[in-house]
Amino acid sequence: MSYRYDDNTSIKASYNRMVQYLHLLSNTASPTPLDIWAPSGKYIKPQLLDQYAIGYFKRFKEGSYTLETEVFYKDIQNRIDYINGANLVANNEIETVILNGKARAYGLEFLFKKNEGNFQGWIAYTLSRSEQLTKGRTESEPGINNSSWYSTPFDKTHDFSINASYQFNEKWKFNSNFVFQTGQPANYPVNQYEYQGINVPVYDANRRNANRLPAYHRFDIAATLTPEKNKTRTWQGEWVFGIYNLYGRQNAASLAFRQNQETFRNEAVQTSIFGVVPSVTYNFKF
């Protein structure tokens, strides 16, 4: 549903209902990023999502610039999560270590774009929260986080990005992209005990996802070379030279804890997947 105030201004509202039969479980405390997909069935109900949104849209200078803002709220039913101490690796009875709960997500999205000229780009920012409430199977079972709201693995308070491109001439085009995101929620141990000479971390069952991985950010650049079109060919090609994560940020994919062999204390071990990644790509189109 939309209402046009004038040729450059409009207000839009929307409602969506979606059903998902595959459920994702993530664990950032494993030595490597761990994602488990669980299908709906006798013990796992399909996930239902109701989304409400209202937005304001504005064009400037005959569409050379556009501004988009939107407020949204999502209500999610039957969202699963794993119980405290669950083993997600090689578990053939995953339904025995998960509980059904409900979740909510809400926030504000902002997007400003420059659409014309040799220099184009956009700035985007999202301020949001994503939380879950998961009670036990019975009234006597405490549930997750003592049956209180807690952050989901997808909760990113701040999500900021800038994209810019410059058409230098008919052959060369330069692009850059910067991304900053609040670190993913995680569980850190609050204590430890010794068992058969090994320090075992202890987690607070009432503080699910109370900690966070370090903030995620990176800067990418690329240059695109488009040679003059060969009139004898029916297709046009281009070369793309890029560098992903230019300044080599070691973004954390997960965080695990192990015993230091010198101090015999548990220490955090960060797993990072990508550092600086140069690339050369050749694209063609007919």
Q: PLM features: residue spans?
A:
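Residue-level signature of outer-membrane beta-barrel architecture
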Residues: 2-3, 46, 58-60, 112-116, ...
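Gram-negative outer-membrane beta-barrel transporters
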Residues: 73-75, 94-190
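Short loop/turn motifs that connect adjacent beta-strands in outer-membrane beta-barrel proteins
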Residues: 6-8, 61-66, 118, 171, ...
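Surface-exposed extracellular loop regions of Gram-negative outer-membrane beta-barrel proteins
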Residues: 3-51, 73-95, 136, 177-198, ...
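Residues that define the transmembrane beta-barrel architecture of outer-membrane proteins
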Residues: 48-52, 102-106, 115, 156-160, ...
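Extracellular loop and loop/strand-boundary signature of outer-membrane beta-barrel proteins
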Residues: 33-42, 56, 93-99, 107, ...
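C-terminal beta-signal and adjacent terminal beta-strands/loops
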Residues: 19, 76, 171, 180-199, ...
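Transmembrane beta-barrel strands of outer-membrane/channel proteins
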Residues: 13-17, 35, 56, 67-73, ...
